[in-house]
């Protein structure tokens, strides 16, 4: 909701402002980010209200969820591979822009910042324009998002000009704007109310897992051939899309 929109708004403004600041020096965005972190910390200390005291509910034994729980396993598979692919691509995107367009370091920061802003704007637009207007199940949203992401990776692999790179970034942002919330809400809806804390931990670990493996693979593949990370991710997402198509969304039973 509002928190997700705020995150996407930051994703739009941050790269755009960072690209402008990089025109001063490449270290300027880092100094400004440090200053913003300090301002945020002061705001939290002096202005953020205390959380209301929760009424004590009857204690229920917390249930540990396994990654292999059949209710959430499909979402765990999708989440881990999805975030691995995204991390693999994001690790090499700035190099891709620099190599394809023949840019200097400063020009790369400015151009890539603009592209990241466009990607975040597309993510926000897909959430506001689609997810909040149409009531579809998480798997249906994943079925829409996966082809968009597959097309984005193909565009990144084939790109030989700035326009195709920007199109790829917009597609990637729109696809992840649908896939990310669908993955998290799908895992949450698959379990009971008293298991929400456990499933949040399990599902939340898919992102760090993907971003642990993905960058290592991205750098390795990029050294071999610059378009290889994107073709590899393209190849990973094809069976992932087939897997999503093969799953029949199940309605959660109410007790």
Give the ranges of each region predicted by the language model:
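Helix-loop-helix hairpin linking two adjacent transmembrane segments in secondary transporters
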Residues: 6-45
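Helix-to-loop junctions at the C-terminal end of transmembrane segments
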Residues: 125-138, 222
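A late C-terminal transmembrane helix in Major Facilitator Superfamily
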Residues: 194-223
